[in-house]
Amino acid sequence: MHAYRTHNCSALRRANVGEKVRLSGWVHRKRDHGGLLFVDLRDHYGLTQIVADSDSAVFEKLDQLRLESVITVTGEVVERAPEVVNPNLATGEIEIRASEVDVQSFAQELPLPVAGEADYPEDIRLRYRYLDLRRDRLHRNIVLRSNVIASLRRRMIEQGFNEYQTPILTASSPEGARDYLVPSRVHPGKFYALPQAPQMFKQLMMVAGFDRYFQIAPCFRDEDARADRSPGEFYQLDFEMSFVTQEDVFATIEPVLAGVFEEFGGGKTVTPAPFPRIAYRDAMLYYGSDKPDLRNPLKISDVTEHFRDSGFGLFAGMVAKGGVVRAIPAPEAGKNSRKFFDDMNNWAREEGFAGLGYINIKNGEAGGPIARNLGEDATQKLLADLGLGENDGVFFAAGKEGEAARLAGLARNRVGELLDLIEKDSFRFCWVVDFPMFEYDEEAKQVIFSHNPFSMPQGGMEALETKDPLDILAYQYDIVCNGIELSSGAIRNHRPEIMYKAFEIAGYDQAMVDENFAGMINAFKYGAPPHGGAAPGVDRMVMLLAGEPNIREVVLFPMNQKAEDLMMGAPAAVSERQLKELSLRIAVKPTQKSAS
């Protein structure tokens, strides 16, 4: 018999009754039923119930063990009585009558419980992450992550991609988020950077003639944490393809993503390919966001002209100054009390906006300050154009276009949730396309890149030379699922002359481009194919599939919101010897010990 186990803790069934077996695992729960001691033994695979009589040689040893001690149990598989069969447990028809127990490791008193899913302070959970990971939900999330990555790999290889690894130590880039810097011992005063993404390397691979590249890529960005973003590092399905159009990229990755979500989505509905395409301007108009959640059926309308020179002076004044008015429908909201509408207005103020106007309709009668000031005819025309019913409501966001769109988008989400309109048990994908290439920076008083400076402008050099920069669109796209951005991507600008011109419009001369992006721009001068790709976030995919609200619930050893690893004590001070080797001196001494 094996020294530790003949089976795992999820393997035994009624067919094994009468067999002598050996299991190893953690003491999950103990129950003393007056002369009978029951122990739930847990391993990676599941649970098996162990039973010992009070006159058994192993009773006292089991009774004295703390939860989470690691033991090896030898005994006979016996059938449970019908009244104590547990249909919710894979091994629920049997139990092991213990004859031998060997303690492999004693557990101290636990700082947090493993059994159950009690909500516990996050700092404790992260400090003792190895205990937290024993909990069933979190354990399943990490296994799910492993399976998702394996499925992504298989599907990409089936599409003709090869997996390659790009460098982790690279050069710092002036674009994007803050870099994590690594000092060089050999070159004092110089620094490597951890890659924010393998962007330049994967493009250089296309220049080198590798046609289809992918990797599960670690990425490092010194940026603040959010619910859907880990501080420090994250992983993405990074891929790039040569000689492709935007539609080729879409057609390649859609079946990969749809397939993974169908495989691991637990029967939830998944948007079939091809995914809907929504222009950026339409996304901002109809959904108030470039990350639209299509589970929400509500669409925003522009009603600016209804308020131009209208009787509602507040909105009329905003429109006269170049502002806009956006309407967010609220089906059947008129059946609610006025408090529903006032609460929405108060919520908007709490979010930092001036407020949210509204009209509530009860049995066909429009109420509220806006309806009174607009007048009956203008109000009825507005409601008719919006297609509202006799007990609907509508909210209004007014102001500068960007601000009004943002408020309208947030209000759309909130109304959808409050009125229970969000489609359940579904994953709704879409592409957001036709992003603007440039935008105007009010503070700097100049045109800057709107998003990705390395994407190909639609219309190429001709567009850059003849069109207003603010009218130029880019071959740039985002893939969104349930309101969460999974990836940005683009058809790349592979022509040096077009790249120089695009950067010139954004205020960079040729010397600056050559200095900051020498590796890529020089490579493009030796023959570069048209190419494009994207990089869907693995962490966010798993978060959606696991139904978790926070990305830290699907990461093995995450940092906290302050970018601290409480378990390993990072970041931490280093010795003077280490600093001297790197030719570094700390200008500001840390005032307190972090991650302690």
UniProtKB/Swiss-Prot annotation:
Keyword Protein biosynthesis (UniProt): yes
Location relative to the cell: Cytoplasm
Enzyme class: ligase
Pfam name, any one: tRNA-synt_2
Binding site for ATP: R221, D222, E223, E485, G537, V538, D539, R540
EC number: 6.1.1.23
Region annotation Aspartate: where it falls in the sequence: 199-202
Residue numbers marked as site, Important for tRNA non-discrimination: H33
GO cellular component labels: cytoplasm
Keywords, alphabetical: Aminoacyl-tRNA synthetase, ATP-binding, Cytoplasm, Ligase, Nucleotide-binding, Protein biosynthesis
Catalytic activity, reaction form: tRNA(Asx) + L-aspartate + ATP = L-aspartyl-tRNA(Asx) + AMP + diphosphate
GO function terms (MF aspect): aspartate-tRNA ligase activity; aspartate-tRNA(Asn) ligase activity; ATP binding; nucleic acid binding
Origin superkingdom: Bacteria
Transmembrane regions: none
Chain positions recorded as L-aspartate binding sites: E175, R221, H451, R492
Alphabetical list of CDD domains matching this protein: AspRS_core, EcAspRS_like_N
Any GO BP: aspartyl-tRNA aminoacylation
Matching SUPFAM superfamilies: Class II aaRS and biotin synthetases, GAD domain-like, Nucleic acid-binding proteins
PANTHER family noted in UniProt: ASPARTATE--TRNA LIGASE, MITOCHONDRIAL, ASPARTYL/LYSYL-TRNA SYNTHETASE
Quaternary structure note: Homodimer.
Family membership: Belongs to the class-II aminoacyl-tRNA synthetase family. Type 1 subfamily.
Role: Aspartyl-tRNA synthetase with relaxed tRNA specificity since it is able to aspartylate not only its cognate tRNA(Asp) but also tRNA(Asn). Reaction proceeds in two steps: L-aspartate is first activated by ATP to form Asp-AMP and then transferred to the acceptor end of tRNA(Asp/Asn).
Protein name: Aspartate--tRNA(Asp/Asn) ligase
Gene transcribed to yield this protein: aspS
